[in-house]
């Protein structure tokens, strides 16, 4: 699981972003992390992977403090950021450099997802469009078969057919022993994917419910 405990974070001393956030996310779900721009969605994801650190409180992944960035934790979480910095290598070389960090990486699965996206591994990463780079990194993330797959605005830069392929490959990833968090403000792109919703605003947790729970609360019975 991913747990935020009494989580506090700010970029500047007098600009508090999170103050005492408590949130638990379980494997086996696809979470939609929703909120307006600047609400703190990206900050949460970056704290989960340990590239940012809480000012107090903690964030744990599978019981390990993410701020420690232990190899055992990093090998079980993959983060697809909104902005990608692609190295000047071809895709095959990228795989050789990065796959060893993920013990469960499957080249067969990577090639399968790349085929879904109609991309070839001979391509140079830095010469691809932003949308194509996202597809490569998503294919790599799926192929890592980590416990957690975190994505920040993953459908930005994708055309309609690519968004359809995105939904297909993400659906293939989910299992009881894996979890997915998708941060977005384009809910239409993921509404058929997610089974749970987390809404934050100005660093506060407004909602953390499954779609089933929400549906049950909104349902009504016809009265004869």
Please tell me what each predicted stretch does.
Residues 57-68, 72-73:
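Conserved ABC transporter NBD signature motif
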Residues 31-36:
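The feature captures the beta-strand-to-loop junction immediately N-terminal to the Walker
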Residues 79-136:
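ABC-family P-loop ATPase nucleotide-binding domains
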Residues 1-21, 27:
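A short, flexible loop at the N-terminus of ABC-type nucleotide-binding domains that lies
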Residues 149-153:
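Catalytic Walker B motif of ABC-type/P-loop ATPase nucleotide-binding domains
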